[in-house]
């Protein structure tokens, strides 16, 4: 079970949004690289980074901040936001990103995901962000007519490394993960699934360690860390004990 601390980038700063609304952004750190180093020092083993401006623009917009993070941390980094073509994927993987996350393009251009997964095995994840059961795209500004399961099933045999499933209604609101929907998705496909949206406290860690969540690869945690509602040492120790049991 992997806990992915999240760094969301807006105007080169580390922010958290509420329900994906760019007008409801709280700046938590002016220096994303320092934030990444802090997460590494706390013992996290995999970093989750999103270029929020890039998600809206359809191309990388916070490249300088991402590159600064890649220089200071040795842990794997998965990156999403504005990754819509093979050239961008190849560029980021070449710069040291471990895994790219394709969101909007996974809905609009599934062939891109399949080709990328073929060219870069194990290094392409799909981000599915759902609002009322339907997948949202373009930085969550638009909602499609397809469900997360319908899209995930398109990639069943494509070699996608993971599906990151976000419940937009909970994102940034500290209401707890939507494990029912996430587990239902994980049980319907063979691709590993990562839970995202609403992580609130140590109770979410405990829920992730229950037998029913065994198919999940992990979860992304954002505001709960920044607000001090989740003690990293306590969370990682709990996961470590469960892994050793």
From Swiss-Prot:
<dbReference type="InterPro" id="IPR006062">
    <property type="entry name" value="His_biosynth"/>
</dbReference>
<dbReference type="InterPro" id="IPR006063">
    <property type="entry name" value="HisA_bact_arch"/>
</dbReference>
<dbReference type="Pfam" id="PF00977">
    <property type="entry name" value="His_biosynth"/>
</dbReference>
<dbReference type="InterPro" id="IPR044524">
    <property type="entry name" value="Isoase_HisA-like"/>
</dbReference>
<dbReference type="GO" id="GO:0003949">
    <property type="term" value="F:1-(5-phosphoribosyl)-5-[(5-phosphoribosylamino)methylideneamino]imidazole-4-carboxamide isomerase activity"/>
</dbReference>
<feature type="active site" description="Proton acceptor">
    <location>
        <position position="8"/>
    </location>
</feature>
<dbReference type="GO" id="GO:0000162">
    <property type="term" value="P:L-tryptophan biosynthetic process"/>
</dbReference>
<keyword id="KW-0963">Cytoplasm</keyword>
<dbReference type="InterPro" id="IPR023016">
    <property type="entry name" value="Isoase_HisA-like_bact"/>
</dbReference>
<comment type="similarity">
    <text>Belongs to the HisA/HisF family.</text>
</comment>
<keyword id="KW-0413">Isomerase</keyword>
<protein>
    <recommendedName>
        <fullName>1-(5-phosphoribosyl)-5-[(5-phosphoribosylamino)methylideneamino] imidazole-4-carboxamide isomerase</fullName>
        <ecNumber>5.3.1.16</ecNumber>
    </recommendedName>
</protein>
<comment type="pathway">
    <text>Amino-acid biosynthesis; L-histidine biosynthesis; L-histidine from 5-phospho-alpha-D-ribose 1-diphosphate: step 4/9.</text>
</comment>
<dbReference type="InterPro" id="IPR013785">
    <property type="entry name" value="Aldolase_TIM"/>
</dbReference>
<feature type="active site" description="Proton donor">
    <location>
        <position position="129"/>
    </location>
</feature>
<dbReference type="InterPro" id="IPR011060">
    <property type="entry name" value="RibuloseP-bd_barrel"/>
</dbReference>
<dbReference type="GO" id="GO:0000105">
    <property type="term" value="P:L-histidine biosynthetic process"/>
</dbReference>
<keyword id="KW-0368">Histidine biosynthesis</keyword>
<keyword id="KW-0028">Amino-acid biosynthesis</keyword>
<dbReference type="GO" id="GO:0005737">
    <property type="term" value="C:cytoplasm"/>
</dbReference>
């Amino acid at each position: 079970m992997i806990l992915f601390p999240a760094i969301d980038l807006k105007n080169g700063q580390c922010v958290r949004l509420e329900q994906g609304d760019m007008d409801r952004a709280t700046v938590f750190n002016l220096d994303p690289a320092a934030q990444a180093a802090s997460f590494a020092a706390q013992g996290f083993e995999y970093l989750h980074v999103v270029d929020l401006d890039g998600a809206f623009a359809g191309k990388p917009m916070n490249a300088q901040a991402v590159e600064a993070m890649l220089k200071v941390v040795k842990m794997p980094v998965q990156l999403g936001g504005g990754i819509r073509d093979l050239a961008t994927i190849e560029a980021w993987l070449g710069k040291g990103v471990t895994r790219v996350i394709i969101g909007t393009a996974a809905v609009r251009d599934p062939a891109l995901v399949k080709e990328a997964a073929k060219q870069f095995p194990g290094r392409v994840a799909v981000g599915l962000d759902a609002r009322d059961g339907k997948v949202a795209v373009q930085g969550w500004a638009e909602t499609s007519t397809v469900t997360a399961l319908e899209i995930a099933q398109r990639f069943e045999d494509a070699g996608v490394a993971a599906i990151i499933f976000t419940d937009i209604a909970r994102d940034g609101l500290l209401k707890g993960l939507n494990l029912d929907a996430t587990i239902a998705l994980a049980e319907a496909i063979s691709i590993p699934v990562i839970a995202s949206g609403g992580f609130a406290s140590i109770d979410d860690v405990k829920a992730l360690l229950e037998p029913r969540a065994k198919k999940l690869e992990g979860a992304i945690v954002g505001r709960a860390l920044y607000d001090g509602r989740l003690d990293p040492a306590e969370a990682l120790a709990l996961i470590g004990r469960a892994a050793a049991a």
